[in-house]
Amino acid sequence: MCLGRVKSAMANQELFEKTGIKQCVIQEIIQLAQKYDVQKVILFGSRARGDYKLKSDIDLAFQGGKGNYFSFDVDEETSTLLQFDIIDLDKPVQDELLESINREGIILYEKV
């Protein structure tokens, strides 16, 4: 359910305007990251660049934690019908994809 506010490097409204992702969906992703002890969640791809289309998927990369549970629940328990493409950075990742994540990624959550 969409409640609460997002605490992110970007202001809430700025994040929504750039990515087109509702504040509540970002908050749900953050809560799942905390639940499954994920260390870091990065938004990348067209939504991070701001050149997404209405039905563009949400590309996420993450490090640490219980990745299988996190990936499954993000797909099943967030308040959006958009598809997710989720990359586990603790597994082998193509160099080009890793460069793209590092270049354009927006950190949504980082455990301190």
Regions found by a protein language model. Name each.
Residues 1-40, 48-54, 63-112:
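Catalytic core of pol beta-like nucleotidyltransferases
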